[in-house]
């Protein structure tokens, strides 16, 4: 299984736990399907990454559904995703998140591509108490607001290089060099 596939299985495993813990009483459930919402950049400057995000979400949904879906109580549910194109625009993304929640009845969100757009959507999902699994936002600002309904699978960006810097310092010390920071 390649790294991308593993990442999205982790994302959706996390989502499955969130869904199971919040119950289906308030979710968009039609028959045996739980519909998730996502405002993703399919056009605009983030389109390439948004398309990768959408394909990753679709792959994860397929893998989970092929394995029987998400079990809540004694019942298994398949997953589906309702997408809207946020046009790589934070304001449009926030409006679409609100539309997904208020008009489409979505109660579980998948995050968009990028920190800036996630920063715009997070207050909307918080306002409506809708859990959002964020796979592509890493800005420190996402982790310092005290969001209760935002679940991230990435570390914050300021933590990305910590282990690399530690390794570099360790190797410099082993080579007898004094690394100054």
How would you describe each model-predicted region?
Residues 31-33, 37, 76-78, 95, ...:
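Extracytoplasmic
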Residues 91, 106-181:
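Extracytoplasmic ligand/sensor domains, especially the bilobed periplasmic-binding protein
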Residues 33-41, 79-83, 179-181:
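Short, well-ordered beta-strand elements
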Residues 69-87, 147-149, 181:
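Short beta-strand elements in bilobed, periplasmic/extracellular small-molecule ligand-binding domains
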Residues 29, 55-80, 173-175:
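Signal peptide-proximal N-terminal region
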Residues 37-58, 84-91, 113-116:
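Extracytoplasmic "Venus flytrap"
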Residues 82-83, 87-107, 169-171:
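Short, well-structured alpha-helical segments in soluble
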Residues 1-35:
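Short, low-complexity disordered leader/linker segments with a strong preference
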């Amino acid at each position: 299984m390649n790294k991308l596939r593993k990442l999205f299985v982790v994302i959706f495993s996390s989502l499955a736990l969130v869904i199971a813990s919040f119950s289906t009483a308030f979710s968009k459930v039609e028959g045996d399907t739980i519909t998730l919402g996502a405002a993703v950049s399919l056009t605009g400057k983030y389109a390439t990454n948004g398309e990768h995000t959408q394909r990753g979400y679709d792959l994860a949904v397929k893998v989970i559904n092929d394995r029987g879906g998400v079990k809540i109580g004694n019942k298994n549910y398949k997953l589906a995703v309702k997408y809207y194109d946020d046009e790589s625009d934070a304001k449009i993304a926030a409006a679409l998140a609100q539309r997904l929640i208020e008009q489409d009845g979505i109660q579980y969100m998948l995050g968009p591509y990028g920190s800036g757009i996630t920063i715009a959507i997070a207050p909307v999902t918080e306002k409506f108490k809708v859990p959002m699994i964020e796979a592509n936002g890493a800005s420190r600002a996402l982790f310092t607001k005290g969001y209760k309904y935002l679940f991230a699978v990435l570390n914050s960006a300021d933590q990305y290089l910590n282990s690399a810097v530690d390794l570099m310092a360790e190797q410099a010390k082993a080579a007898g060099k004094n690394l100054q920071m």
